Amino acid sequence: GIFSKLAGKKLKNLLISGLKSVGKEVGMDVVRTGIDIAGCKIKGEC
């Protein structure tokens, strides 16, 4: 019915926002790691 449709929509939105924030965290880690690797390559410390 109407209730399950609303519940499904809310769950979907929660899931999407959860995935987005997880993606952002992972993305930041990847960027940081990339910067670290680039930095040590430039300095020749890898």
From Swiss-Prot:
It comes from Pelophylax ridibundus. GO terms for cellular component: extracellular region. It is found in: Secreted. This is Esculentin-1R. Belongs to the frog skin active peptide (FSAP) family. Esculentin subfamily. Expressed by the skin glands. Keywords: Amphibian defense peptide, Antibiotic, Antimicrobial, Cytolysis, Disulfide bond, Hemolysis, Secreted. The keyword Disulfide bond applies. Shows antibacterial activity against representative Gram-negative and Gram-positive bacterial species, and hemolytic activity.
